[in-house]
Regions:
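Conserved glycine-rich cofactor-binding loop
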Residues: 8-11
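N-terminal Rossmann-fold NAD(P) dinucleotide-binding loop
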Residues: 14-15
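Conserved glycine-rich Rossmann-like NAD(P)H-binding loop of the short-chain dehydrogenase/reductase
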Residues: 24-40
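Rossmann-fold cofactor-recognition segment
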Residues: 45-60
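Conserved Rossmann-fold cofactor-binding substructure of NAD(P)-dependent oxidoreductases
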Residues: 56-74
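Catalytic loop of short-chain dehydrogenase/reductase
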Residues: 83-89, 98, 120-172, 179-191
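Ankyrin-repeat alpha-helix packing hotspot
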Residues: 105-106
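C-terminal helical subdomain
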Residues: 177, 193-244, 248, 252
């Protein structure tokens, strides 16, 4: 059985993935933004390996989450599931970053750099990453007029590129990105037409399955089928520029 940490596991895909893995006998560490949100997984807590608390719009709290996870011991897998969707404005974190960038891009990068290296990494992407910009000149939206859809697409391009970077730079780790589809969660809304179960089954499969098809690295997946990611996501030159930019924005270096 595996030890798995899942970010954003208080509801939606993260909660569904956590429940399935717990039901299968895995040791799952849950995450919630705050203690009030943690109440949403009160039914899972008695069977979980732990619960960590932290708001990913805060760099300080994100680092605190990494510390909490490391105190619990090494994980076999980490599922970077947490994210926010169409924010009405750029917002500004305590560090001055756009909220979408902080939660969807900077937090997964920071956690990856700070949490003891697991055997498997899974990053929640989106088909919308194909609409992301291959430029990192203004990824923090300090110069452009705010565009919620574009900002979200770019953030998902970032995590897809991060997953594929690590597949190359960390050969001992299986690193993959997953498009869960447009599923009927709080984020996706009731009109979403994709299959919720297939949305979370792919991430749990990549995180814990011993099937040969799941023990691969460098994939971009949709419903257990490998897909073609955006060109930039797989471009080593773009990947290097992105990682350097994320390191500069966070002050944290990703060790290779």
């Amino acid at each position: 059985m595996s030890r798995v940490f899942i970010t954003g596991s208080a509801d939606g895909l993260g909660r569904a993935a956590a429940k399935l893995l717990i039901d299968e006998g895995h040791d799952v560490v849950l995450h919630a933004r705050n203690r009030e949100r943690a109440a949403a997984v009160a039914d899972l807590v008695p069977r979980a390996a732990g619960v960590v608390i932290g708001d990913f719009s805060s760099a300080t709290e994100t680092m605190g989450v990494a510390d909490q996870v490391n105190e619990l011991g090494r994980m076999d897998a980490v599922i970077h599931n947490a994210g926010i969707f169409l924010e009405p404005s750029r917002g500004s974190t305590a560090e001055g970053h756009a909220t979408t960038l902080a939660v969807n891009s900077l937090a997964p990068y920071m956690l990856t750099a700070l949490i003891e290296r697991p055997d498997r990494l899974v990053y929640l992407s989106s088909g919308m990453h194909h609409g992301g910009s291959g430029s990192i000149r203004d990824i923090d939206w300090t110069q452009r007029r705010w565009n919620a859809s574009k900002a979200y697409s770019e953030s998902k391009l970032h995590v897809t590129a991060l997953a594929l970077t690590l597949a190359r730079e960390w050969p001992g780790v299986l690193s993959n990105a997953v498009d869960p589809g447009w599923v009927p969660t709080k984020m996706g809304g009731p009109a979403a037409s994709d299959d919720l179960e297939l949305g979370y089954l792919t991430q749990t499969w990549l995180a814990a399955s011993s099937e040969a098809a799941a023990t691969v690295s460098g994939g971009y997946w949709y419903h257990r089928q490998r897909q073609q990611p955006a060109r930039e996501a797989a471009d080593p030159a773009f990947q290097r520029k992105l990682i350097d930019r994320l390191a500069g924005l966070t002050g944290i270096t990703l060790r290779t």
